[in-house]
Amino acid sequence: MKTPYTKYLIIIIALIGFNCGSNTAATTQTKTPAPFNLITEKQFNDLFPQRKPFYTYAAFIKAVHDLSQIKVKVTRRGISFYQYIRTDKTTGKSVTVREDQDFNADWNKKKPESIYIVDYADFCMAKDAQTNKKELAAFFANVAHETRNGSIGTYDDGLMYIHEIDTSNAYLAPNDVYPATKGKKYYGRGPIQLSYNGNYGRASDFIFGDKKVLLNDPKMIETDPVVAFETAIWFWMTPETDKPSAHDVMIGKWQPNATDKAEGRTPGFGMTINIINGPVECNKGDDVKPMNDRMGFYQFFLKQFGATDLNCACSCGKMMPYYY
């Protein structure tokens, strides 16, 4: 485990409060992100009283801070040709970390193009205090469910697994851009239980600017708690093909198109479940234990944060999942 990040925590604790909607501490002149003051160390520990010692408040805060220095411009042409330009805000340097073969081919330049900016400084900091609290409650609810080791209906047992119990499955999938490294396994690791070589490689591109870091050393997610939390935040903040990010859903940025509406997808917490584990938990009615467990955690954490979601579309029971 890494040593505590004392210096950084002193700064954070001095500024702690629930006023996370205020970004006055950050200025465009210094480009310093506002301190993540949505949750105190005591509150974090109270939410996860049985957590593994691996999962510390210090590691979570450092992951939030470090990722806030990264912004990625995602350009998609056609269905599946991508370019990622990663900017390190501390240096101002931008580097193309992914550009698919034929991305700039003449025939491909004629394809429809979409551009999306992923700014990790927006994690639970993009809106007013109440919206930010709801987003953090939703993030922690999904994390707690993924890593719980207790009885359904109790909400004190999140962050108890660093990796999934059964590590015999390597979770390998054909991927030309992010091929698996020989002999490595990509089973679920970290707070969001990141799985498959494609996700490991893509997360590595965004977090490190080098896909090989996590493809070659997937165990880093279970040995470095900061990286573990970074992968969870990455998954939360980053859209995939036509699937929006959970972040955009919770801040109200994502709105369903005609296809989404026809397939029952609506803004709200239920959509985050669809994004994370839709094929297993969604479009199967409302009597699905994992889905209801996530919903229970969400309502529990909202209460702890002094927030409400009165019009919560919490269920994904009638939503078609994404199959990619």
Residue spans for each PLM region:
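Extracellular low-complexity, O-glycosylation-prone Ser/Thr/Pro/Gly-rich "stalks"
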Residues: 24-44, 48, 256-324
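Peptidoglycan-targeting cell-wall enzymes and recognition modules
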Residues: 26-238, 264-268, 272-275, 280
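Short, flexible/disordered secondary-structure transition segments
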Residues: 150, 154, 243, 309-312
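Short, well-ordered loop/turn and helix-capping segments at boundaries between secondary-structure elements
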Residues: 200, 238-242, 303-307
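Short clusters of hydrophobic/aromatic residues that line enzyme substrate/ligand-binding pockets
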Residues: 250
